């Protein structure tokens, strides 16, 4: 059996909100596997569902930029939050976000693209690392485009114009007036930032994630002792709830707390007299899925001193 450390118990407790002894038992049951321990706690009703695995612990910035009917979003990571406040770093993120519009979202291609300052993006990044004195890295990028309509950007927790901690793009396909679409898109983008949808619609949700929810619901329902047909209904109800809560078009609009996003779009289309399609969205949260390595500062000092 794997050794269960205090750090692992602490990490599981922070992630799930479950009690310390429950977290220790879950890790024992899961042989030290964090994801399996989360599932065990949820199956026992001891932890709330987490839409995203892992803590958001990496630093840096997310940038967004629009050019006509195209929009780009980029995440650049750094070691500390101090770098995110550095104007040179902010300008770098903005500049490379603009290059996504031209060269696309593939990070390898982007790294080799020519930078306005001279050399490649990677050359400028390397120079910045030397100047600022801290490691930095391009993590991910996305590009949205529509033929007719708008791509609307939104930055949450803005650090400087166009860069912040959460970046969202919303693509609306329509021949409705652009100012009308931009207003609608801004509201939907703010919703996306707050509601963290995992997919545009229920059919687009990750099959493995849905089946994981089904397995957790099955185990939880089976422990209720109810007849098999009721257990089946409980499981299907839980899966349906998961789908509605995680698909953007099925979510309840955070602005009014009662209307589904799909109905918000339909109502807007009727208002303007032109069909409107919510084509796509992208949401980047800084450090999503990355855990920063925790270190013992005293041990680091001792190691550096050769103690």
Swiss-Prot record:
InterPro entries named in the record: EF-Ts_dimer_sf, Transl_elong_EFTs/EF1B, Transl_elong_EFTs/EF1B_dimer, Transl_elong_Ts_CS, UBA-like_sf
Keywords carried by this UniProt record: Cytoplasm, Elongation factor, Protein biosynthesis
One Gene Ontology cellular component: cytoplasm
Region listing for Involved in Mg(2+) ion dislocation from EF-Tu, in residue ranges: 80-83
GO molecular function, one term: translation elongation factor activity
SUPFAM superfamilies on file: Elongation factor Ts (EF-Ts), dimerisation domain (SSF54713), UBA-like (SSF46934)
Protein name: Elongation factor Ts
Protein source organism: Zymomonas mobilis subsp. mobilis (strain ATCC 31821 / ZM4 / CP4)
UniProt gene name: tsf
